[in-house]
Amino acid sequence: MKTNEILHDEFLSVVETQLKSNNPPETKQTYERLISLGISDKDAKIYIAQCVASEIFHTIKHKRPYDEQRYIRNLNNLPDFPAE
């Protein structure tokens, strides 16, 4: 599947905002953990962006509010792909 560059950039923008604002703090903790595993800066942010995308998709598909706890569980499971 071809990457939608606009969505890709927007998801990465969300990650950058979360890292700068430290909100939620688990985003920065996850980023630092991924870096410590030898994952590059770019790839660590892409992994986190996958969690952002998964949460947005889940919210739209199920017509439910954003679930920060699910998002954090997915962050904690990285570098494995989001499970929920």
Segments (PLM) and residue ranges:
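Structure-specific DNA junction-binding interface
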Residues: 1-84
